[in-house]
Amino acid sequence: DVCSSDLAVSFSAQMMGCLPVDREGNPLRPMIIWADTRAVEEERWMVERIGMERGYEITGHRLSASYSAAKLIWVRRREPDIYRRWYKMLHAKDFIICRLTGKFVTDYSDASGTNLFDIRAKMWSEEILRALDLDEELLPELHPSTDIAGGVTKAAAEATGLLEGTPVVIGGGDGSCACVGAGVVDEGSAYLVLGSSSWISLASREPLFDPEMRTFNWVHLDPELYTPCGTMQAAGYSYQWYRNALCRGEMEEAAKTGESPYERINRGIMESAPGAGGLLYLPYLLGERSPRWNPDARGAFVGLSVTTGKHDLSRAVLEGVGYNLRVILESMRREREMKELMLIGGGAKGQTWPRILSDIFQMPLKIPAYREEATSMGAAVCAGVGVGIYRDFSEAKRINTIVDTVMPREENRLRYDRLYEIFNHAYDALTGVYGELGAYRKDMGEKHE
């Protein structure tokens, strides 16, 4: 058995996907995940039908190919046979819940990443469904994250080793679970996740609406809170791409010594001065959500010269992610004061990247003991609240205590402030090129996702 005294099961999983299943809960096609932006044409159609501003007002999100609704419509248009057999759309965690309990449910946090959810009323939006000619019956039943979907069935118990009847607490999307795991459970507290993708978010009693629609809103695991958020697509992905594409030597040497190749790259970064010799990296390998909302955007190095060295390239990648995150941070600071950020995720390991980010933000970063496990911890706390083991979500702060604080260095402020402005100018200058390349990829039949 997995455990002889299971108290509850709950989940954290990727958000904004689209998995159509039949009445038995069997997938009708592979899930279209959050990073897949194939539904660009569907996004444009949605904007025509609803209006970008109205969509943002209802859902707390821009209308975008990144979200579930555009993916659903893509399937309806391009895979009609699958659409005819469609019973429910599920997210990743909801599919597992269905397997364990036989129930087709989702929680408010995952629903808030569909472009179909009324963020204030916490219900599927009749206005949007009507505009898109969608039936609410295609969508799962809505619940708070702490609701119990049901008990583990006998068949699921035999397949998994879980105890039959174990309560299955619905849990939430990884963004909302990370918020709880980071201890961001009080109004105004904020955090940064530095993972494959990256986001900055805070806890708020009300959704926050950016006049330029650069940020968006999830529902917190606590149904009385929201998590206004800005997310970039390729943070850790940028570092992973760079390692795989340009650091074969470091990978081979690391394999010989048993250390992480990132440790070797990070040591080299210390040989490049802050600012990477005036080299900029634009981290748009997967297009971009906030702050740019441009699925055609792509990555670039700007400022290469004959004096550019390998360590400058390495530093520029980490700094470029930091500049992009600062755009998100500053848009959120317009609405709420933030004096410090909790830092979690794989990028929080070591000192190199956290120190670069602290300098670019000119803000302290607090690092908890469980920096890589925060999302699963958030789901575990949700399970505890759901079955009554914990009184409320404040338990997360007791479990995941602060073990380190990275302070910004004043001597790097001017350098990074200036490069941050140039970074934004570089993006603006390349927007036309991104559009032309997007049209080229479409004309040549190359994949957008």
Annotate the PLM regions:
Residues D22-R23:
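Short, acidic, Ser/Thr-enriched surface-loop or helix-capping motifs
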Residues A13-M15:
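Short, small/polar residue-rich loop motifs at catalytic or cofactor-binding pockets
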Residues V40, V47-R62, S66-V105, N115-D133, ...:
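Active-site core segments that coordinate phosphate-bearing ligands/cofactors
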Residues V2-S4:
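Short, small-residue-biased leader/transition segments that mark boundaries at the very start
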Residues D36:
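Carbohydrate-associated surface elements
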Residues V9:
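Acidic/charged, solvent-exposed loop-and-adjacent secondary-structure segments enriched in E/D, K/R, S/T
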